[in-house]
UniProtKB/Swiss-Prot annotation:
Binding site for substrate: 252-254
Keywords: Glycoprotein, Hydrolase, Iron, Metal-binding, Secreted, Signal, Zinc
Record protein name field: Purple acid phosphatase 8
Keyword Zinc (UniProt): yes
Tissue distribution: Expressed in roots, stems, leaves, flowers and siliques.
Length: 335
């Protein structure tokens, strides 16, 4: 029986988070909200990453969820990460929108997936009621759900920084077409972005963790449909490079992908295959940087210990597609 192990850490995390929010409110300096994620007794952590998924089980979402449950059990995962676009096509309209149950609670039902889910917002989520996804009511409906715009998960040997990337993208403001975006809490935009970039930079500088992982919905580097996000290349990437981030994990492109930068030690991982994928939609890329690309559904796992970080990509049938690992001394390996 692992029910106590599943439930108690979630309650502990929420309690610590509430305390952090209270303390932050008394502090005049801006600071990203923080969660504390307890590691395993040996200090290691294991988690799954999935993105671009919320389609009421269609486009193989249920099949991917099934395999996530199996792999999650095998790895005894501690938590999960969603890279955004949690609910298609236009987010949710309220905390009581049936999409939440139909696309999340009733899909990811495996015992191994009853762990904290750390979520970021994607552009499709911004087309709905953003405050609904951020509402604590969702945590009352399903205690796994954790979603803020930007925040940090502290897990001793690894710090994970979640960044709200949608407001960086110019075309959502300049050329929204028929889409209506919920920009409440984001405007004035320049002030929001400047504050966010400062907060992320400060949080990264203050991190004492062995590993630093940044999660955002949008790509920084990708050979997929959307390609590179120029705004993030110009504004966010220099901060990540200056602070020696190990991984940048994103969704947005509906594929699985690993790009190894030749300009820095950052590894760019795309996990956007949670449901609908874009078969054959891939652009040319420098073969020295492209480690792996898969134009189908799937997800990835991450394992961290004091000395090692391991990433594995799986397809919708649970087959291993790509493995990569690194040691903190800079030794890399495609397994």
């Amino acid at each position: 029986m692992d029910s106590l192990r599943d439930v108690k850490p979630i309650k502990l995390i929420f309690s610590i988070f509430c305390l952090v929010i209270i303390l932050s409110a008394c502090n005049s300096t801006a600071e990203l909200p923080r969660f504390v994620q307890p590691p395993e007794p040996d200090g290691s952590l294991s988690f799954l990453v999935v993105g671009d998924w919320g389609r009421r089980g269609s486009y193989n979402q249920s099949q991917v969820a099934l395999q996530m449950g199996k792999i999650g059990k095998d790895l005894n995962i501690d938590f999960l990460i969603s890279t955004g676009d949690n609910f298609y096509d236009d987010g949710i309209i309220s905390p009581y929108d049936s999409q939440f149950q139909d696309s999340f609670t009733n899909i990811y039902t495996a015992t191994s997936l009853q762990k904290p889910w750390y979520n970021v917002l994607g552009n499709h989520d911004y087309r709905g009621n953003v405050y609904a996804q951020l509402s604590p009511i969702l945590r009352d409906l399903d205690c796994r759900w954790i979603c803020l715009r930007s925040y940090v998960v502290n897990a001793e040997i690894v710090d994970i920084f979640f960044v709200d990337t949608t407001p960086f993208v110019d075309r959502y403001f300049d050329e929204p077409k028929d889409h209506v975006y919920d920009w409440r809490g984001v405007l004035p935009r320049n002030k929001y972005l400047n504050s966010l970039l400062t907060d992320v930079d400060v949080a990264l500088q203050e991190s004492m963790a062995k590993w630093k992982i940044v999660v955002g919905h949008h790509t920084i580097k990708s050979a997929g449909h959307h390609g590179n996000t120029i705004e993030l290349e110009k504004q966010l990437l220099p901060i990540l490079e200056a602070n020696e981030v190990d991984l940048y994990i994103n969704g947005h492109d509906h594929c699985l992908e690993h790009i190894s930068s030749i300009n820095s030690g950052i590894q760019f991982m795309t996990s956007g295959g949670g449901s609908k994928a874009w078969k054959g939609d891939v652009n040319d890329w420098n073969p020295q940087e492209m480690r792996f690309y898969y134009d189908g559904q799937g997800f990835m796992s991450v394992y961290t210990s004091e000395a090692e970080l391991r990433v594995v990509f799986y397809d919708g049938l649970g087959h291993v597609l790509h493995r990569w690992s690194t040691l903190k001394n800079g030794v890399y390996s495609d397994i």
